Amino acid sequence: MAVKSYKPYTPSRRFMTTLDNSDITSKPTVKKLLIKLPQKAGRNNLGRITSRHREAGAKKLYRIIDFKRNKFGVPGKVATVEYDPYRNCRICLISYVDGDKRYIIQPEGLKVGDTVMAAEAGLDIKPGNAMKLKNIPVGTVVHNVEMKPGKGGQIARSAGNSCQIMGREGKYVILRLPSGEMRYILGECMATIGTVGNAEYQNITIGKAGRSRHLGIRPQTRGIAMNPVDHPHGGGEGRSKGNHPVTPWGMPTKGYKTRKKKQSDKYIISRRKK
């Protein structure tokens, strides 16, 4: 899959790039795996903005993904590779021998016709197979990793991401996360072998404002361009700066650590690198 550029027929097209989508084999065919999500657009139940610069974006249907991979011992064949508007990686439709069909995140190298399976242990170390962390060899690259047994994968789910199993200690497995953080994860948690596909996604250029709006991203106004009532950086004569960068609510930003202490901090061996 290559990055596709365009001739500059318009100024917005000059720098815009996309992926060629040659890996997509089908449109959605299983309607029971498609649902319509309510559009929050960054608002809470009172209609107030809780997440700025968000909007609904283009109309789309949510694909129900099998993050738990709990269909043990039943082989399934990759029927299609599809586009998912809610994520930057591709998804695969798995058709199991018992007639069940489920979507999974597409690992790098998995193609139509390949067979995948989930089990507690004893499977081949090949992309798409899922096992418990305690039964996967040290050094293996995995994705879609659970943080709590049975909850479903939460770690390393976006395009090109993966974790690496670094060792074992008692009932825990030492995992290196995509950020570089080293962390203990229970060995009972499930993980899928391989790296998430569509790694070239990071190389595309949005190129124009309208494409961001389709993705549900609204424009960001600089604080220095606002009035004093709207932002601590606002006001002044001309272009005045002269103060430390802060959020609209006065909290220091750009490098200031705001992460609260959590009970789960004891599972972090080393924090991520900058």
UniProtKB/Swiss-Prot annotation:
Stored SMART domains: Ribosomal_L2 (SM01383), Ribosomal_L2_C (SM01382)
Question: Which domain of life, per UniProt?
Answer: Bacteria
Q: What does the entry list under GO cellular component?
A: large ribosomal subunit
Give the Gene Ontology MF terms in alphabetical order.
rRNA binding; structural constituent of ribosome; transferase activity
Hey, which family's this protein in? Answer: Belongs to the universal ribosomal protein uL2 family.
Membrane-spanning ranges: none
- Under which name does UniProt file this protein? Large ribosomal subunit protein uL2
Q: Which organism is it from?
A: Nautilia profundicola (strain ATCC BAA-1463 / DSM 18972 / AmH)
User: What InterPro entries does UniProt report for this protein, alphabetically?
Assistant: NA-bd_OB-fold, Rib_uL2_dom2, Ribosomal_uL2, Ribosomal_uL2_bac/org-type, Ribosomal_uL2_C, Ribosomal_uL2_CS, Ribosomal_uL2_dom3, Ribosomal_uL2_RNA-bd_dom
Chain residue ranges for the region called Disordered: 223-274
Write out the biased-composition intervals (Basic residues).
256-274
Role noted for this protein? One of the primary rRNA binding proteins. Required for association of the 30S and 50S subunits to form the 70S ribosome, for tRNA binding and peptide bond formation. It has been suggested to have peptidyltransferase activity; this is somewhat controversial. Makes several contacts with the 16S rRNA in the 70S ribosome.
Asked if the Swiss-Prot or TrEMBL record annotates the protein with the keyword RNA-binding, the reply is yes
